[in-house]
């Protein structure tokens, strides 16, 4: 089972890419902390203090302003996540996230739905941060 979905933000790819790879910026909308920014070949620990959770990601590939690929085990099973950015209409960027792969059974379906919810939260929180300077995790204006 795989999940793949897209959304558009009215900003250029470079600005969105920076908000995703920079751990200080990412902690203003998605995670509560990390020990590093996203860099190809690096192992990074992401933390969600409000969920009392942390997860190590293994960054496989980074293409400036275009692509981030990493492996993690957020559902207890290793999966690969690919975040791709491409210019859309003038001044907009299409973001596509694909995560794979879970077993093709009921539990795999549950994991996929759980991650789809998480990535939907990511999209919404990224937009709120970049467009309105709001952290949806805390409800605070930054």
Regions found by a protein language model. Name each.
Residues 33-42, 55-57:
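A solvent-exposed, acidic/Ser-Thr-rich amphipathic alpha-helical stretch
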Residues 101-142:
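A conserved amphipathic terminal alpha-helix motif
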Residues 49-92, 100-103:
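Hydrophobic-ligand binding "helix-grip"
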Residues 4-10, 45-47, 58, 84:
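Generic structural detector for well-ordered beta-strands
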